[in-house]
Amino acid sequence: AGRYVVDNHLFREMGIPDNLVEMIRYTWADERHAHLYSRFDLAYDEQEQHVKLIECNADTATCLPETAVVQWAQLKSNGLDENSQFNTLHEELVERFAHIRLLNDDLTPSILFSTLRDYPEDDTNVSILMEAAREAGFDVAFAYIDEVDFSETEGLFMHDPHNAAFIRFDFWFKLIPWEFIGNEEKELASILTSLVKNRKLVVLNPAHTLLYQSKYILKVLWDLYPYHPLLLQTERHAMPHKKSVAKVLFGREGANVSIIEKGGDVSESVSGEYGNQPRIYQEYFPLQTDEAGYTYQAGLFYVNEACALGFRRGGKILDNTAQFVGHMIE
């Protein structure tokens, strides 16, 4: 599906900012800019006994500490067998970082991790990745995005207050959405394009992950593989004869999602800051529900291969109030 988007120049349909297309094409064609990790959100079809793809979080997926550490600790603290859980997320992250380091052995294995300030949950997610990178042989550091300096000719730097010097890094992991950079930080998008193309910087996740972060990829998949048992019908326009879910192309945590009944009435919706974006309409599929009325959605982490499972519990639309739920395989 990603190749189809690139070959057919569907970037605008995907909602991808024009100023990121050059970097997307470049990183797509160069295997040294490998994808680090993503999370697939899935629903389970109990009748047909297979899963349905809800969406893919390819750029800035979270729930790392809950999946890698918390649910594993729950097993250990209760004296349960840790092998009764599908969870090798940390080990796979270490291996993937090591692979990326080897792909880029012409660069210094130094990586700076960054988030937006005042989002402590993002900082916790990044701490998991920092430990994995450290175990993979990287020198690691952290700085908020407003503390990072970018030079179009020299690279990426962090100020070291201890000796009043600037430290250069050849790798940068940002838990900051690519589309935010493209739309809101246009100068930074231009600088990053130059740095990446001139081998001054490797950015994780790479720019081509926007191909999968955009929910328009669900429409592309349906067009390529209509009625595939793992997919739900997805269209650019509302489906008046079928219950559906309206989603903006780059929304997060359930923001600006609506459930639309047959005939067009909205039965459930969550507000948010992404309302001016284009939408796709995905066939509604009921999530599994417990006796208290909570719904459950599976999150499957992918790091070169599927490697960990966790669940989120909440209402009809899972938003930023959803709770993480661990699992055990009997």
Segment roles from a protein language model:
Residues 18-33, 127, 223-225, 247:
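Short, charged low-complexity intrinsically disordered segments located at boundaries
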Residues 39-60:
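Structured, charged N-terminal subsegments at the starts of enzyme catalytic cores
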Residues 45-47, 60-66, 71-330:
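Domain-scale recognition of functional cores that engage charged ligands
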Residues 13-17, 26-36, 287-293:
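Structured beta-strand/loop patches that form or line metal/cofactor-binding pockets in enzymes
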Residues 1-24, 80:
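Low-complexity, highly charged intrinsically disordered N-terminal segments
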Residues 22, 26, 31-46, 282-283, ...:
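A short glycine-rich, hydrophobically flanked beta-strand micro-motif that places a catalytic Asp/Glu
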